[in-house]
Amino acid sequence: MKIIFMGTPTFAVPSLEKIYKEHEIISVFTKVDKPNARGKKINYSPIKEFALANNLKIYQPENFKDNTLIEEIRNMQADLIVVVAYGKILPKEVIDIPKYGVINLHSSLLPRFRGAAPINAAIINGDTKSGISIMYVEEELDAGDVILQEETEISDEDTFLSLHDRLKDMGADLLLKAIELIKKGEVKAQKQDKKLVTFVKPFRKEDCKIDWTKTSREIFNFIRGMNPIPTAFSNLNGTIIKIYETKINDKVYNNATCGEVVEYLKGKGIVVKTSDGSLIISSAKPENKKQMSGVDLINGKFLKIGEKLC
């Protein structure tokens, strides 16, 4: 099939790689280049890097308001547009162009977690499973009929990164199956149950702050779901400490307040009081320091007993 691929981050690369091997990629659309943190070097998206390495035609429009661009897409005579974490919403004029429409890979079991950050949300909300949905694209965000879905279990050892990496490979394989069904005319798409729809908004910095008045399980899930992106944090004496890994501790400290450092556990880390128990911080990054283990936090005396995270 003749395919236009639209994507941007690392998550989209396995999908483009597999489609490139089995189909004709007419062009690749990705978000505009961005300067790095210091503003001295332009960073290409992972999808652009792949496209350049394989001599694929690249487009990086700010939007799809240019009639000339719409006409150029129309002249490509694509059978299908495939979208994987592109980061832009397509207008109806583009959706209507390809012979077989536009399909999207979404990293949740729709209709749960439409929108941004569904991988983070699944872990933060304590879900025991997540997955991939391949769906048709409509004007309404993530509302199209679902072509295929595949599930994966979420364990207590999973973080955003581990689930992200698992889903990006699962998604690439499922996408190829969906394209084959479309090619053969064997798609039996299912409408989403509107009663089960939930949404996830992009995370703001303030959304990443840990609320120590929540339960140990809730905070444990929150930190895992933020690891390593966008990273959960707390304030400590006017500085920021990013927290990457914790373990649920059985011990309850009734005389302490939530967020208080209550104990050092030798060989494990620093214990912090929660609403129903405590957590052991086993990996964190104090402001202007490198990421370190809980043991190194103790040895460096970065968190003292009696201090409070807030």
From Swiss-Prot:
Class of enzymatic activity (EC top level): transferase
Keywords, ordered alphabetically: Protein biosynthesis, Transferase
GO molecular function: methionyl-tRNA formyltransferase activity
Family recorded in the similarity comment: Belongs to the Fmt family.
Species of origin: Fusobacterium nucleatum subsp. nucleatum (strain ATCC 25586 / DSM 15643 / BCRC 10681 / CIP 101130 / JCM 8532 / KCTC 2640 / LMG 13131 / VPI 4355)
BP GO annotations: conversion of methionyl-tRNA to N-formyl-methionyl-tRNA
Keyword Ribonucleoprotein: no
Function as written in the Swiss-Prot or TrEMBL entry: Attaches a formyl group to the free amino group of methionyl-tRNA(fMet). The formyl group appears to play a dual role in the initiator identity of N-formylmethionyl-tRNA by promoting its recognition by IF2 and preventing the misappropriation of this tRNA by the elongation apparatus.
Gene3D superfamilies tied to this protein: 3.40.50.12230
A Gene Ontology term for the protein's cellular component: cytosol
Gene behind the chain: fmt
PANTHER family documented for this protein: METHIONYL-TRNA FORMYLTRANSFERASE, METHIONYL-TRNA FORMYLTRANSFERASE, MITOCHONDRIAL
Chain positions recorded as (6S)-5,6,7,8-tetrahydrofolate binding sites: 108-111
Name the UniProt record assigns to this protein: Methionyl-tRNA formyltransferase
UniProt catalytic activity: L-methionyl-tRNA(fMet) + (6R)-10-formyltetrahydrofolate = N-formyl-L-methionyl-tRNA(fMet) + (6S)-5,6,7,8-tetrahydrofolate + H(+)
Enzyme Commission number: 2.1.2.9
InterPro entries: Fmt, Formyl_trans_C, Formyl_transf_N, Formyl_transf_N_sf, Formyl_transferase-like_C_sf, GART_AS, Met-tRNA-FMT_C, Met-tRNA-FMT_N
